């Protein structure tokens, strides 16, 4: 799966099971910065029930609170899932993955990060990048 596909997975959990159509442009502005057009969120499909999304959110929060405290952000409930994938070319390097969203109780951002060809697990290779992205997005 691509990073975009995995970001859509994280976003689907955050959105109660709804898979949203990804967009690249939030809005188009004129030279005076007034909004000319605004992208509207669109649901592509429902992947699973909101009940299942709630259970997945609890499990993903536990990944942060119990297993990977380095992904935690003070004052923010973070939901994440780390992953490590072998590259398969005969060497010992791996891809380190993490997907997640925050705040878990009122999601504003969903993220997927992959760091290719590293010697670290997902929480250590990709985790700090996800955390920094979330902190920056939530600070705005």
Each language-model region and where it sits:
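Helix N-cap and loop-to-helix transition residues
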Residues: 2, 49-50
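Active-site beta-strand/loop architecture of penicillin-binding DD-peptidases
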Residues: 1-43, 60-140
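A structural-propensity feature for long, helix-poor, extended segments
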Residues: 42-44, 50-51
């Amino acid at each position: 799966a691509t990073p975009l596909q995995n970001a859509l997975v994280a976003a689907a959990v955050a959105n109660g099971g709804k898979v949203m159509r990804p967009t690249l442009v939030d809005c188009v502005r004129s030279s005076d910065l007034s909004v000319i057009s605004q992208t509207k969120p669109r649901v592509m499909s429902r992947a699973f029930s909101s009940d299942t999304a709630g259970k997945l959110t609890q499990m993903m929060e536990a990944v942060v609170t119990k297993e990977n405290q380095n992904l935690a952000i003070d004052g923010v409930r973070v939901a994440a899932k780390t992953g490590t994938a072998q590259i398969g070319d005969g060497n010992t390097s791996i891809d380190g993955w993490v997907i997640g969203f925050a705040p878990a109780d009122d999601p504003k951002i969903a993220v997927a990060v992959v760091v290719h060809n590293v010697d670290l697990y997902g929480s250590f290779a990709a985790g700090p990048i996800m955390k920094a992205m979330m902190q920056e997005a939530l600070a705005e």
